[in-house]
Amino acid sequence: MKSKIKSIDHEVIREILQKHDKRVIFEKTNVVPDESELREELEKVLGLGHVSQKSVLGLDIYQYSSYGEFEQMLIPFLFKTILNTTIDLCIDNHPFIFQNYSREQIEKNFISTGDGGFLIFDTPLHSLLFASNYAIVLRIYNAFHFFPRLRKIIGGISTRYAITYDKVYNYHDNFYGRAIINNARILSRDSLNRCLIDEHVHRWFTVNIDGMENLQVITIDDVSHIQDFSNYSTLPLATGSDKIFGRESSRREGIINSDILKIGKIKAKETDINIYNLHLQVSLSLVNNDDESQKKIVTVSLGNLNTTGI
């Protein structure tokens, strides 16, 4: 079972500094101090080895600054509305996988950037499913099925995606860590509206489902046997259905196509991280909650096939 995000206590660190350091020191002779005792105490408190890995999904509205000032003022509302709708879809469409999440928890683990943001999940599969449902909502908005008059005012919206998997921690109700840093770096380097993932995400899918190409053939039973879901309740498997991973393998709905290609590297500290371009085609059956007689099957692409490097 995934551990909680580690929280760093400001007061604990301050007390250690009061014990092993001085806030200000002015001496006639400058001396480089021995920091070994302070380092040892800080390492015990921070517990770097116990900082859990989390998956971060980065969403960025492409060329937000190119919209008019009036439209720019409306886009944060639109993004928030699409995000809330996506949260509801994920909880409804994937009762087994998202059983440990509520809308409040997902919103709490969201870092807003104004024209997008970062969502923190336990596994890359959570991030991928959220991105897929988001792409569905974005498509019905762009196709004038979701607030069509607002769509006419603002215009079409494009989003670029990034998924990373690394350490994340919490300090003063803010989130930090390499997963967030690398995600922001990937998004800033992409100008082609793709869905990019790092090598840690790629490795997670390779270990757990024998590669991302198998997303189009695995079942919800296969998902339930992934190690990260071993402590999940199996009750949702009996009482509900997953809208992407069926009980039997099918390419009529859910993920009907998946392509993955390595496109380059980014620098992270002293190491290089391989970056992959992911392209999925996802088909979902949607029902209008305001009028359940209205139904529609929507197929979208998450990412694209542009293989230009990063």
Stretches found by the model and what they are:
Residues 17, 38, 42, 46-48, ...:
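Generic detector of leucine side chains in alpha-helical contexts
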Residues 47-49, 58, 68, 114-117, ...:
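Residue-identity detector for glycine
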Residues 1-42, 192-193, 199-310:
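Intrinsically disordered, glycine/charged-rich C-terminal tails and inter-domain linkers
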Residues 29, 33, 54-58, 109, ...:
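Functionally constrained cores in energy, signaling, and assembly domains
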Residues 20-133:
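Catalytic NTP-binding/metal-coordinating core of nucleotidyl cyclase/transferase enzymes
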Residues 122-255:
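Catalytic beta-strand-to-alpha-helix segment of the class III nucleotidyl cyclase homology domain
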